[in-house]
Amino acid sequence: QIWNMEGFGSGNQVQPGMCAYGATKRAVNYVNKALQKEVKGTEVQVCTLSPGIVITDLLLGDYDTSSPEWEKSKKIFNILGDTVATVTPYLVDGILNADKSGAKVVWLTGGKAFSRFMTAGFNKRDLFADL
């Protein structure tokens, strides 16, 4: 199995400061589709992981946590984000259960994102309490 990981840019999102990262993640879609065609008829499986927003040092490294921009981003991260410890078991289970090329393991689905926004006022999360 070959697994590639999507990220910001995979779904055509564009944001200043994310050019290189977003371009490489957008390329993941093309690479996976092309590889799936190239290995068709073989035992090789080409699959995709889509972890959603995971709170990591890579994500946080470019933010000035004393800025107003950080406060806006932090609100979104607390609604849509998750910790590595939360997301990893789900991704691993998906990998272990994938049985065909083209499999995609998605943590933050559109439905889950919608639900989180709808319940954000009642379900206060603070993924940054330990920062």
How would you describe each model-predicted region?
Residues 122-131:
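N-terminal charge/polar-biased segments
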